């Protein structure tokens, strides 16, 4: 494991040194800032086995927050995911995949989440292959703007208003996870949107630094207070009141608040929240909190290895525990 991590780290350090700074990099291409964001994610991943990595997270996060990188939070969370909300003018984006109606990069998120009978905002039905849960929606504070695009109702193609209380509703499991804004051309473009897919944002740096400060070995009261203040910056943009430092006076309490903010801030973006829960040994706990599933077990944190890999390994490759 140490050799593998060192190999990845060396590659990213080289990239961070030789790639252009964000203000010099072409939008949609790799930059020094993106390489350092990936370093942060690598270091966070390794804190599960060595908390000393939090010191590296703290160092790199502070570097990304220096003026020379030019990152800043956007004032409007919702507009960031609407048509025209991306591009080089958006200084919160660390890396995004440019998408357009005619490619080569395509965004089919609307089709993934819209019910088959959806008919509003100039858009028609999708495939409805992804949904959210009402437990997730209800976990937000009422005035949190980040749940704006969790649609709790919609107009159907037959003119019926569908909501969570409609009998046999397509919203029975949860709201529509329309993280991207309305794009009227989706229906006529084969399901493609012109809204770019944002993978990493500056808000992640704030919350990563908050975690490093509060979870590192020997975190002081001042470290905890600073961590809470960083979380509050992200909450303020969402229209929420500040969390109280006096109520979050232990690393464990700060971590719980931090994970909730990650849950609410980055839903349906890059899928890393599952990994965050795993490295803190909280995945099963969170899954059971949502639906109390009897099938949620710790061994499922790892996927089974393909049978072909085990056969080709000729005894050297062992199946992950729980799948034998």
What kind of feature is each model-predicted range?
Residues 4-20, 27-65, 95, 144, ...:
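Extended, hydrophobic/aromatic-rich amphipathic alpha-helical segments that build helical scaffolds
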Residues 23-35, 78, 246-250:
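A glycine-rich, coil/turn loop motif that links secondary-structure elements
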Residues 47-48, 66-74, 238-244, 264-269, ...:
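Secretory-pathway/luminal and periplasmic proteins that interact with or process carbohydrate-rich
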Residues 59, 63-215, 280-324:
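Elongated scaffold/linker segments in the mid-to-C-terminal portions of large proteins
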Residues 76-88, 245-256, 261:
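TPR/TPR-like alpha-solenoid helical repeat scaffolds
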Residues 108, 242, 248-251, 271:
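Surface-exposed loop/interface segments of Gram-negative outer-membrane beta-barrel transport/assembly proteins
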Residues 253, 257-264, 292-297, 322:
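C-terminal helix-and-tail extensions that cap enzymatic domains
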Residues 261-264, 274-277, 281-284:
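Active-site-adjacent helix/loop patches that line small-molecule binding or acyl-intermediate pockets
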């Amino acid at each position: 494991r140490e050799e593998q991590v060192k190999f990845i780290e060396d590659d990213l350090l080289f990239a961070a040194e030789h790639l252009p700074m964000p203000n010099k990099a072409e939008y949609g291409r790799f930059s020094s800032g993106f390489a350092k964001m990936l370093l942060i994610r690598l270091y966070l991943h390794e804190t599960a086995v060595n908390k000393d990595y939090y010191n590296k997270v703290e160092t790199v996060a502070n570097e990304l927050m220096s003026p020379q990188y030019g990152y800043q939070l956007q004032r409007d969370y919702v507009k960031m995911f609407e048509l025209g909300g991306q591009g080089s003018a958006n200084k919160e984006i660390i890396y995004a995949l440019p998408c357009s109606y005619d490619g080569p990069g395509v965004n089919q998120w609307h089709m993934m989440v819209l019910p088959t009978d959806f008919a509003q905002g100039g858009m028609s039905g999708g495939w409805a292959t992804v949904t959210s849960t009402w437990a997730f929606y209800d976990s937000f504070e009422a005035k949190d703007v980040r749940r704006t695009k969790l649609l709790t109702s919609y107009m159907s193609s037959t003119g019926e208003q569908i909501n969570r209380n409609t009998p046999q509703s397509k919203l029975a499991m949860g709201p529509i996870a329309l993280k991207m804004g309305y794009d009227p051309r989706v229906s006529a473009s084969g399901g493609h949107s012109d809204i770019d897919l944002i993978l990493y944002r500056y808000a992640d740096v704030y919350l990563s630094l908050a975690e490093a400060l509060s979870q590192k070995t020997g975190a002081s009261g001042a470290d905890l207070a600073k961590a809470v203040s960083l979380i509050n910056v992200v909450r303020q943009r969402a229209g929420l009141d500040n969390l109280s430092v006096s109520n979050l006076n232990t690393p464990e309490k700060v971590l719980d608040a931090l994970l909730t903010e990650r849950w609410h801030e980055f839903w349906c973006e890059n899928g890393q929240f599952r990994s965050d829960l795993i490295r803190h040994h909280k995945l099963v706990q969170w899954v059971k909190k949502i639906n109390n599933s009897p099938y949620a077990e710790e061994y499922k944190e790892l996927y089974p290895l393909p049978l072909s890999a085990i056969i080709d390994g000729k005894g050297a490759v062992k199946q992950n525990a729980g799948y034998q």
